A protein has these predicted regions:
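Conserved G1/Walker A P-loop phosphate-binding module
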Residues: 1-114, 142-143
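C-terminal-of-GTPase-core extension/linker across diverse P-loop GTPases
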Residues: 2-8, 13, 19, 142, ...
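Short capping/connector residues at structural and topological boundaries
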Residues: 6, 35, 40-43, 50-52, ...
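Phosphate-binding glycine-rich loops and adjacent basic patches that engage nucleotide phosphates
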Residues: 14-20, 48-60, 88-112, 125-135, ...
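Short, glycine/charged-enriched secondary-structure capping and boundary segments
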Residues: 22, 84-87, 116-119, 218-222, ...
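Glycine-rich, flexible loop/turn motifs
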Residues: 26-34, 41-43, 51-54, 83, ...
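Amphipathic alpha-helical transducer elements in NTP-driven molecular machines
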Residues: 35, 49-52, 65-71, 85-99, ...
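Conserved Switch II/interswitch segment of TRAFAC-class P-loop GTPases
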Residues: 43-48, 75-85, 96-158, 172-185, ...
């Protein structure tokens, strides 16, 4: 099950430098040129989770396999992208394919690196990108109205429901608000998702600051954080330049380097976790002497569907799930101890998997 987070931003905000650091590769050409990222670069990153290391230690697992999140570095957006300016058409097509958006905002001053708008104004940069995405959504929805109206007049129930959703979204977008803020009922979620709106995707703001501000941020990142709070979104402050340096170091060297900067952990770890939370994902584990492995599912997933992430046969033939809470697995020294303490539960088809569950599935072939 793949989950994709698209990295977006105006040209020269540090987007590709960040992507390179994320994937520990120089796949993206992080040059001081507006359209250096023409084809989207895709990279998978491990989601840091100390629980997995602890489980592997207890079970003496031979291998540790973390869950992964995919980041897509998308070509820099410019004003007018909704009308195909710059690399707008490619940008818009690619962003439709991701599940969430990490919006990199330039929060540093550097006379050697040009800003496409000529000044450092992170909130204005955010508005530029949001506006282009909203204009693209408006165009997309307006093209559907006539066809849906005709179908609705012919008593097409689905068309009536979709037309109502489209009209409500149009009102919101014309007010200058992204589609993700549209109030909707649970039963409307599927139809809403099918609209494929760019501004419906959850957003994480990444404040790219200068090295000296990596620990505490600066006035620019504070403004973005306040904007995120008002939106009910999340903002992460990092220095892409520092992260690209950290990416080349060994684990021991990273710890020493972070300490000298006054940082407890790499900014990328915070970013990856924030992306994971943004997508409302949780982790369950399978643990044994061969391997300890983390698996990604959406919050609210029931046991059979969770089993299906490992293999479709597990879901089709699901019987039950032997389940131990992470805290119990650790407290009682593993599966045998948890079983003896009565902490191993047999869960059926309606069980909603909890974050951190250690699971073993029983199924019919």
């Amino acid at each position: 099950m793949g989950f994709k987070c698209g990295i977006v931003g105006l040209p020269n905000v540090g987007k590709s430098t960040l992507f390179n650091a994320l994937t520990e590769t120089a796949a993206a050409q992080a040059a001081n040129y507006p359209f250096c990222t023409i084809e989207p670069n895709v990279g998978e990153v491990a989601v840091p989770d100390p629980r997995l290391d602890k489980l592997a230690e207890i079970a003496k697992s031979g291998q540790i396999i973390p869950t992964r999140l995919t980041f897509v570095d998308i070509a820099g957006l410019v004003r007018g992208a909704s009308k195909g300016e710059g690399l707008g058409n490619q940008f818009l097509a690619t962003i439709r394919e991701v599940d969430a958006v990490a919006h990199v905002v330039r929060c540093f001053e550097d006379s050697d690196i040009t800003h496409v708008e000529g000044k450092i104004a992170p909130l204005a940069d955010i508005e530029t990108i949001e506006t282009e995405l909203m204009l693209a959504d408006l165009d997309s929805l307006e093209k559907r109205v006539d066809n849906l109206t005709k179908k609705a007049k012919g008593n097409d129930k689905d068309a009536k429901e979709q037309l109502d959703l489209v009209n409500r979204a149009l009102v919101l977008l014309r007010e200058g608000r992204p589609a993700r803020f549209l109030e909707r009922k649970p039963e409307e979620e599927r139809a809403f998702g099918m609209l494929g709106l760019l501004t419906s995707k959850p957003v994480l703001y990444v404040c790219n600051v200068e090295e000296a501000a990596s620990a505490k941020g600066n006035k620019f990142s504070e403004a973005v954080a306040e904007h995120a709070r008002k939106e009910g979104a999340v903002a992460v402050t990092i220095s892409a330049k520092i992260e690209s340096e950290i990416a080349t170091l060994s684990r021991e060297e990273r710890v020493d380097f972070l300490e000298t900067l006054g940082l407890e952990e790499a900014g990328l770890d915070r970013l990856i976790r924030a992306g994971y939370q943004l997508l409302d994902l949780i982790t369950y584990f399978t643990v044994g002497p061969k391997e300890a492995r983390a698996w990604t599912i959406h919050r609210g997933t029931k046991a059979p569907a969770a089993a299906g992430v490992i293999h479709t046969d597990f879901e089709k033939g699901f019987i039950r799930a032997e389940t131990i809470a992470y805290a119990d697995y650790v407290a009682f020294g593993g599966e045998a101890g948890a079983r003896d303490a009565g902490k191993l539960r047999l869960e059926g088809k309606e069980y909603v998997v909890a974050d951190g569950d250690v699971m073993h599935f029983r199924f019919n072939n």
